[in-house]
Amino acid sequence: MNYIGAHVSSSGGLEKTVLRAIQIKATAFSFFTKNQRQWFSPPLIQKKIDQFKAMCIKYSFQPQQILPHSSYLINLGHPIDELLRKSRKSFIDEMIRCSQLGLIFLNFHPGSHLNKITENACLLRVSDSINIALEKTQNVIAVIENTAGQGTNIGYCFEHLSEIIKNIDDKSRVGVCIDTCHLFASGYDLRTKKDCENTFEKFNSLIGLKYLKGIHLNDSKKKINSRVDRHESLGLGEIGTAAFTWIIKNENFSNIPIILETANPMIWEEEIDWLRSQKKL
C-alpha cells in the first residue's frame, strides 16, 4: 500500500504531529523533532516521548510511515572544521532524538562546499560525517535527500548520492529520499511517463532502488534544470500531473512514505485524495 502524507508542524508538542496528519487523512507524515532554525534544543523529556508513541499507536502509524527531517543548519560537508564539528554534533543529537521516539529514519540535506573545497572533498566529508553518526547511534537510518543544486549545494545528481553511499561503512543504515521538485530543478525530466521511467532507471542503475526510503512529492515553480528550489502544488507547476500519477501507481514505491511539501497546506487533504484516486485508475 502507499503511505501518503505531508510535512506537518510540531508546534505545541510532537504528539500534535500525529493529529495534524490524521486531519488531512494522511497515512504518512514528516516533521522536525526540534526547532529547525536552531543547532540544539533541550533534550526530549520522557513524558513527551511517551505521548508521541501513544498517539502513533492509537492512530496506527508505524515507524516506516514517518520521515522526520533534520535542521536546515546542518552541513555535513562543511569546509570549515569548527562548523563541521558543530554540524556533526547536531546531527548525532537528531539521530538520538529519532531513536528515542522509536523512529527509524532521519532525512537530511547533504550539505554545501561554499566554494571553499571541491565537490569531491565535500562528498567525502558527508560520508565521514554519516559514518561518525552511525557509530554513535543505533537503529536510525540516515536518509540523504537529493538537492536542486542551488548555490553550492551538493547532492544534485545521482552520482553524488552514489559516491556518498559508496563510502559508508554500514550500508544497511543509509538511504535516499527523492524530492521530485529538486530532481526536476537539477535537470532530470519527469514530465511524461517515459521520462519518469528513464530517470528512475538511472537511479536504480547508479544507486539502487533498495536505498529509496522515501519520496517528497512536489511540483516545481521553476523550469527543468533551473537549479532553483521552489515547490508548487501538484499539477500547477512545470512538472505536471503525469509524474505523480506514475509514482503513485508504481509498486516500487509502495511501503515507503510519500510526503507532500507542496506550496499550499490548505489543499493537502485534497492532494492526498487525488493521489489515492490515481492509484485506482
Swiss-Prot record:
Zn(2+) 2 binds at E145, D179, H216, E261. It catalyses: Endonucleolytic cleavage to 5'-phosphooligonucleotide end-products. It comes from the Bacteria. Zn(2+) 1 binds at H69, H109, E145. Zn(2+) 3 binds at H182, D229, H231. Binds 3 Zn(2+) ions. Its cofactor is Zn(2+). InterPro entries: AP_endonuc_2, AP_endonuc_F2_Zn_BS, Xyl_isomerase-like_sf, Xyl_isomerase-like_TIM-brl. Pfam families: AP_endonuc_2. SMART domains: AP2Ec. Its EC number is 3.1.21.2. Keywords: DNA damage, DNA repair, Endonuclease, Hydrolase, Metal-binding, Nuclease, Zinc. One of its GO terms (molecular function) is DNA-(apurinic or apyrimidinic site) endonuclease activity. GO terms for biological process: base-excision repair. The keyword Nucleotidyltransferase does not apply. The keyword Metal-binding applies. PANTHER family: APURINIC-APYRIMIDINIC ENDONUCLEASE (PTHR21445:SF0), ENDONUCLEASE IV ENDODEOXYRIBONUCLEASE IV (PTHR21445). Endonuclease IV plays a role in DNA repair. It cleaves phosphodiester bonds at apurinic or apyrimidinic (AP) sites, generating a 3'-hydroxyl group and a 5'-terminal sugar phosphate. Belongs to the AP endonuclease 2 family. This is Probable endonuclease 4. The lineage of its organism: Bacteria, Pseudomonadati, Pseudomonadota, Gammaproteobacteria, Enterobacterales.
